Amino acid sequence: MIIIEFIKGLILGIVEGLTEFAPVSSTGHMILVDDMWLKSTEFLGPHSAFTFKVVIQLGSVFAAAWVFRERYFEMLHIGKYRNSSINEEFRSKPRRLNLLHVLVGMIPAGILGVLFDDFIEAHLFSVPTVMIGLFLGAIYMIIADKYSKKVQNPKSVDQINYVQAFVIGISQAVAMWPGFSRSGSTISTGVLMKLDHKSASDFTFIMAVPIMLAASALSLVKNYQYIELAHIPFYLIGFLAAFIVGLIAIKTFLHLINKVKLVPFAIYRIVLVIIIAILYFGFGIGQGISG
């Protein structure tokens, strides 16, 4: 039984690492893989299973933080960026992405999270609402890709202004609807703001890390009492799997996104909706899942 639990933890960590920062909705995949198949709540209990998902999400967040560590060091003037000549070089570049861009982008989701986090968790984490989010998010991504073909000179991440950062932040707040996908929503909005796909993805990930760290820390503070010593190895293997797979997935995604764009991910999401709908409405699998 212990080996089976470890395998389940490994699978869930891999799924989290693959999907957290891809525009495909990690929530939708967790419903399909965990709630409909592996059912971690059956051997962890509902509260511990929720805490486990927070822990493995942290693995993905740390992976993104590692990939963009140089950007964060630069914005915070840490390490080699303490050097005045290096700082002067970066400051001299027009509209260099800075910490204020990230903070401005975080404002909408931060406010919405404080006001409605409990409501969203209680009422929107159901299979039908996630399917709606998956489908609408896919349509939004297709629209963004269609628009991007008309943009002649897309902007880089260092050309983002504060208004654009705030608008992209609004789309991050909208993506608190489960299934909509934070990265799918914000990358699409960035593309609509005339950024190229890679730059929109860069800003999405850079902006997402601090707010996801804060949200995860808050969840752990609320639920730390449900972390049992016997479950620590299970949490650890899920965390490490999410971190390692997340590193590979993020680097691969950033390398490919300007070539493949968003439509393939949108089509995948629609297929995922169909699969979940067949299992849910056709076979009754996951009927008991709700917020």
Curated annotation (Swiss-Prot):
The function of this protein is: Catalyzes the dephosphorylation of undecaprenyl diphosphate (UPP). Confers resistance to bacitracin.
Do you know which HAMAP family this protein is assigned to? Undec_diphosphatase (MF_01006)
Catalytic activity reported: di-trans,octa-cis-undecaprenyl diphosphate + H2O = di-trans,octa-cis-undecaprenyl phosphate + phosphate + H(+)
Provide the protein's localization.
Answer: Cell membrane
Q: Which Gene Ontology cellular component annotation is one that this UniProt entry carries?
A: plasma membrane
**PANTHER family named among the record's database cross-references:** UNDECAPRENYL-DIPHOSPHATASE (PTHR30622:SF3)
The alphabetized UniProt keywords are: Antibiotic resistance, Cell membrane, Cell shape, Cell wall biogenesis/degradation, Hydrolase, Membrane, Peptidoglycan synthesis, Transmembrane, Transmembrane helix
Q: What is this protein called?
A: Undecaprenyl-diphosphatase
Q: Which InterPro entries match?
A: UppP
What protein family does this chain belong to?
Answer: Belongs to the UppP family.
- Where mainly located? membrane
Q: Which GO terms describe its biological process?
A: cell wall organization; peptidoglycan biosynthetic process; regulation of cell shape; response to antibiotic
Does the record's keyword annotation contain Cell membrane? yes
Q: What is its EC number?
A: 3.6.1.27
Quote the gene name from the UniProt entry. uppP
Write down the membrane topology. Answer: Multi-pass membrane protein
GO terms assigned for molecular function: undecaprenyl-diphosphatase activity
> What additional remark is attached to this entry?
Bacitracin is thought to be involved in the inhibition of peptidoglycan synthesis by sequestering undecaprenyl diphosphate, thereby reducing the pool of lipid carrier available.
Q: Transmembrane segments in this chain: where?
A: 1-21, 48-68, 100-120, 124-144, 160-180, 201-221, 230-250, 270-290
